[in-house]
Amino acid sequence: MKNMRVELKTKDMKEFYKIFSESEFIITDDSKLINETVNYLKKKYKNSTTKKKLIPLDLFKAIVLIMMKKIKELDSEITLYDIGYEFGKHLNPKRYSDLKKFFKENNLGTLKVDSRKPLVLKVENCSFCEDLSFEEPICYFDAGLIAGAYECILKKPVVVDEIKCMARGDDACYFKVEVVK
């Protein structure tokens, strides 16, 4: 494996995401990388005139990518799913339209029902996968978020698997939702 250090001072976010998506990339100096990421994003957003209630998407993507790399090193991708699951439960949507609205309002993509039996949700224009290229699905957080949200909607335990991912070159991200029996 090759070691590579990313310095954001000389790179734009698109190049940062491209480097991050390389399969052999290892974070060798986490604190410096995190500081460079935060400083880049502070500079980018300091002139913003609107107050943002949520974390800027670029910052969220960078945080999740860093978490993905560290979690993958530990062979534990389930952790991002668990974090998303708890967040989805925290949202506590009462119906599908609440979840769809959440995705739209937070620029996560356009959530649609692709099929009903089995239940497959489609996220078009997934903002997280934009500019990324991976060999495997990467939306563990989103899968967990959908699982937690759908448990609130259906009042039954569910499991969600990402079956297609834009980061793999698919047209959208697809999530299969199954009730646990």
UniProtKB/Swiss-Prot annotation:
Q: Which domain of life is it from?
A: Archaea
Q: Which Gene3D superfamilies match?
A: Trafficking protein particle complex subunit 3 (3.30.1380.20)
Q: Which family does it belong to?
A: Belongs to the M.jannaschii MJ0150/MJ0739/MJ0745/MJ1460/MJ1642 family.
Highest lineage ranks of the organism? Archaea, Methanobacteriati, Methanobacteriota, Methanomada group, Methanococci
Concerning PANTHER family, the annotation shows: ARSR FAMILY TRANSCRIPTIONAL REGULATOR (PTHR35090:SF2), DNA-DIRECTED RNA POLYMERASE SUBUNIT I (PTHR35090)
Protein's recorded name: Uncharacterized protein MJ0745
Source organism per entry reads Methanocaldococcus jannaschii (strain ATCC 43067 / DSM 2661 / JAL-1 / JCM 10045 / NBRC 100440) (Methanococcus jannaschii)
